Amino acid sequence: MIEPRSVVELLQTLVRIPSVNPHGDPGTEGVGEGEIADWLALFLIGLGAKVELREVLPGRPNVVARWPAPGKPRLLFAPHTDTVSVGGMTIDPFGGEVRDGRVWGRGASDTKGPMAAMLWALRESRERLTQLSHEIWFAGLMSEETDQHGSRALAAQERFDFVIAAEPTGLDVVYAHKGSAFFNLTTRGRAGHASRPDLGDNAIAKMLDVLAVIRTEFAAEFAQQRDPVLGASTLSIGTIRGGTKTNVIPDTCEASVDMRFVPAHYQPEIIQRFHRRLEQVCPGIEVSAIPAPPLYTDPAHPLIAKLGECGAQPIGAPWFCDACYFAERGMPAVALGPGSIEQAHTRDEWIAVADLEKGVDFFRRFLARL
């Protein structure tokens, strides 16, 4: 491998390795995290780490590295290696071009830029990593963008005393975010000619009854659940699809609902109650849910204080990330990294070189305080 000479060259290398999450329409044939995991493994070995590739799904591993310091508390740096689709991008998604003081390409902000800043700080600190107060771990987590298989797997395998998930937070420390549940709903009926609706069973009409209950009963409940940092729980109807022609009674209708819970509101019982209520409104409705827990780590945690000494302000975020799966298992976790979340998933994604270099300086100073 060609050794990068700067954090910018490191990020260019990472961007040029396609690692698009294969879920949905990736927009390219270069999917999966296998190639970038292999590259990271070699880079980390060069930094003196003990490295494992832990396969989570076929050909899609987590890359897990540590600088052994037995008996010390464990600190994990945890960026994700996958990106969202490159479909519709207005720039070369894998070009890694440096232009106008920015590095351009898919993942430059989310989250190969923060990953590069972490890695370069570890590289610059490599001679003393085993002498710090904590045993240092690094994990490139697969599949954060869909179902978070990588973080779920590692959180089940290992215990850490503190986790920093890499996200573009402007170098502020996200200690709290909402939980979520993405629901897919399907109602079924019987097709027929629209001139004889009495002979059919309209699946869209059934879905409208379901959505009316969601908007009245559940939306009102969510609006009353508030957090001083994160605001209110929210509920949004995201998509609805049904019917083939105006003169055909639709036999299928699908809708999706996005729920976001403040930490005190998130309970498995709410998801179960939602399912039961929809079944009452429309017997036989098909409901599937993809839940993610909220994140909350005490902002008075000593390592959050050390992050604060480096300039990070404690904040909440409306989105969710891999940190929540470690927190769910009792491990203090936060999200932090250079760059802006507003650049994540955009058609012309970039990160400013100045922000990238600030990220390296931030993580280097943080490591020096351990």
What are these regions (language model features)?
Residues V8, G30, G34-D38, M115, ...:
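Short, surface-exposed alpha-helical segments at coil->helix boundaries
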Residues I2-A108, E127-L132, S340:
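Acidic/His- and Gly-rich active-site-bordering loop/insert found
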Residues L14, P18, L44, E167, ...:
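Residue-level signal for inorganic ion chemistry
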Residues L75-F77, A139, F162-I164, P332-V334:
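Hydrophobic/aromatic beta-strand patches that form the interior of the parallel beta-sheet core
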Residues P58-R60, D147, G170-L171, F320:
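Short acidic loop-to-helix transition motifs that present clustered carboxylates
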Residues M1-I2, E52-L57, Y175, F182-L370:
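Metal-dependent amide/peptide-bond hydrolase catalytic core
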Residues D100-V103, S109, G113-T216, H345-K358:
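Fold-level recognition of mixed alpha/beta catalytic cores in primary-metabolism enzymes, strongest
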